[in-house]
Amino acid sequence: MRFNNYAGAQKMIRYFLEEKDIPQALRKRLEIEQEVIGVMGGNEYPFTYDEALEIMTSHLRDFKKEELDHLKEISATDWIYIDGEVHFQRRFYENLIKTRPDYAKRVITENPEDEKQNHINQNLLNDNIHYMKEHGGRTVHTRIRSTIKAKKEFEEVGRKVRVHLPIPKVYEQVSNVEIHASNPEITYVAPFDAPQRTVYFETELKENQEFMVDYSFDYHVNYVELDPAKVSEEQPDFCLEEQTPHIVFIPYLRELRDELAGDEANPIILARRFYDFVTTKVMYSFMREYFTIECIPEYCAINLKGDCGVQALLFITLCRMSGIPARWQSGLYVTKYYTGCHDWAQFYVAPYGWVFADPSFGGSAWREGDKERWNYYFGNLDIFRMPANSEIQKEFMPEKKWLRIDPIDNQRGEFEYEDHGLRFSQLDVSQKLISMEDIEK
């Protein structure tokens, strides 16, 4: 059993960094470990056992201590030891209510708006599915306003700051990207095809300064019905490589892949088996920051839980291990009711080309008994997206000086001073949909 002696670990790391003559590679590794400990031992797991129990008993009818013990034992709540004491993840309660209907029914003060929003979102998705099937595709013109600023206690007025905010990447789905406004003036706009596209600001920070970009783009998706009988004999060999430390073909994932695949060789059938496994066996779960996880697909396959990106990376890895080209896509899910970060996947099968898989949306549909929506998100996507990233672990243009808040992905932006960067807990970030209109394509 690991008791995570973070205080002792920090002392040892400082000793190696300050007193020992160590290789540069080890120095970099230890500096990253310092950041991981800082996140894990700080904002990510803030609640002690007693505090978690108080949250549960004050929010759920007739909640007992034994229930928290059971949830902890079966890993239904995310927790770790910090210096020998149990600490629960910052969204453990929200995660339980989102993923366990039996506990959601026991909420003492229910928020009718939550149920209303969930119903509205399901209707939006289902209406889009029916439109796509009827018309064969859909195009919208979308306009979004994104902002980022340092929280007051982390604001260092007069110092140089370097700030990145994500914007749409131009490729199959996205065209006609236009920046309408910014504040302050943008220093640099990454190329249209940048794997993680951003606008970059460099300036001296003013009091209460908010960095903003207002942009629009056209977004188009086609509806496809994948037929295994129509698969081409020749398939491409791109997007099949490992990408350490996450897209890696470790023995456990190889065994899982072999178990799911059997003797099947048809890429559509194989990809569907991987999609079915992730959507029916992996429970959706809010996650800690990705850079604190050593291998994301392995975490997903072992713990059978994870959020949208964790599920997408397992699907991508299983596909690549099977000779099916697969890649990452991420950015925002945007509607007039809600805007937030989201990740999904693409896979390539000739003659169809690049098609989509959204395991977390598919899994949600499967748990709700909506078979049509479950099937739809194997091969298809909705219109409510802003894709900013086509790959994981890619540098910005220009690169950040300090360790990124999220070295894997970029959906919220990054903020750094000349001598250190800020964490998400030290920032206020927002994305707002200004408009979304259907257009002819």
Residue ranges and their predicted role:
Residues R2-F3, P23, V310-K400:
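Hydrophobic/aromatic-rich core segments of domains that either
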Residues N4, P191-P195, Y200, L205-I302:
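Acidic low-complexity segments
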Residues M12-F16, K20:
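Inward-facing hydrophobic residues that define packing positions of alpha-helical scaffold repeats
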Residues R29-V221:
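Intrinsically disordered, low-complexity N-terminal segments that are enriched in acidic
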Residues V163, F274, A345:
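Terminal peptide-recognition signature
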Residues P267-F274, L304-C319:
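Active-site nucleophilic cysteine motif
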Residues G379-K441:
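Low-complexity, Gly/Ser/Thr/Pro-rich intrinsically disordered linker/tail segments
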